A protein has these predicted regions:
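Short acidic-glycine-tyrosine-enriched beta hairpin
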Residues: 58-74, 193-208
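A short, N-terminal "cap"/entry segment at the start of jelly-roll beta-barrel domains
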Residues: 1-21, 27, 33, 105-155, ...
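Short, conserved beta-strand element in jelly-roll/cupin
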Residues: 24-25, 36-53, 93-95, 160-162, ...
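Structural motif
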Residues: 43, 50-52, 77, 87, ...
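Double-stranded beta-helix
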Residues: 81-134, 213-241
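Well-ordered beta-strand scaffold positions
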Residues: 18, 50, 58-60, 152-154, ...
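Short beta-strand His + acidic residue motifs that chelate non-heme Fe in jelly-roll/DSBH
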Residues: 32-34, 53-54, 62, 72, ...
Length: 241
């Protein structure tokens, strides 16, 4: 979509439920001016380098390194930039997508993006800023998970599975999309009628009603960012396992 010396933006997956894009920002690169979305959540997961987020009525500056997650639910003022001296790479999520892809292509001027309201919008406490150290941890015999975000429109969990895990059998979700960004692998995914091996950096999406499952494709541990949009009660079921 965009590939210039100072920045690269690639859309990895585009569904009604969410759109996921991969960003590369060189030092000094900035996102849009502070803004709000009235009807959807704007979220970020840092892959490499450091991203500075400005959140809330006072534009509190928070710096995020790899593994950290930030989210601005509806009506939380936010923006972002690379304020460091090295390259930053990160994922950006709009949940639901609401035509964000076409907005980035210059074809949706009515997209849900607005100037900050006079009252500054919702408080900073409504935003999400999660580090691996303060994330909720869920541990099981063959797996461990970090809950990065649990909002009405999105659940985001960093999942790690050790060798010996038997995998997740093919299944469906009727009410939400189940998506994966592979961090460590390889991972074998079954989606619809296809089975493919996904290496780190691969995005996999199972829209509502699509059969999907996964398992190890090698002897190494596997790790991925798992996104449920909307949540569909997934985290509650996971906590009960």
């Amino acid at each position: 979509m965009t590939d210039r010396p100072e920045r690269t933006i690639r859309i990895l997956g585009e569904l009604d439920e969410l759109i996921v894009s991969w960003f590369r920002f060189e030092p000094g690169e900035k996102g849009p001016e502070p803004h709000v979305h009235h009807h959807h959540t704007d979220a970020f997961y840092v892959l490499e380098g450091e991203v500075e987020f400005s959140l809330g009525p006072k534009q509190q500056k928070l710096r995020a390194s790899p593994g950290m997650f930030a989210a601005a639910p509806p009506d939380v003022v936010h923006t972002f930039r690379n304020a460091s001296d090295s390259t930053a790479k990160f994922l950006n999520l709009h949940v639901p997508s609401l035509g964000f892809g076409d907005y980035m292509r210059g074809r949706n001027p009515a997209f849900d993006q607005h100037e900050p309201p006079p009252d500054g919008g919702r408080p900073l406490e409504a935003a999400v800023f999660t580090t691996p150290d303060d994330a909720e941890r869920l541990g099981f015999e063959w797996s461990s998970h970090l809950v990065l975000c649990d909002l009405p429109q999105l659940t985001a969990i960093e999942m790690t599975f050790q060798p010996g895990f038997e995998g997740v059998d093919p299944h469906t979700h009727s009410d939400h999309a189940d998506c994966f960004y592979v961090l460590d692998g390889p991972v074998e995914f079954h989606v619809g009628d296809e089975t493919r091996v996904a290496e780190p950096g691969t995005f996999v999406a199972a829209p509502p009603g699509t059969v999907h499952g996964f398992r190890h494709a090698g002897p190494e541990p596997i790790r991925f960012l798992n996104l449920h949009a909307p949540p569909g009660g997934f985290l509650e079921r996971l906590r009960q396992d």
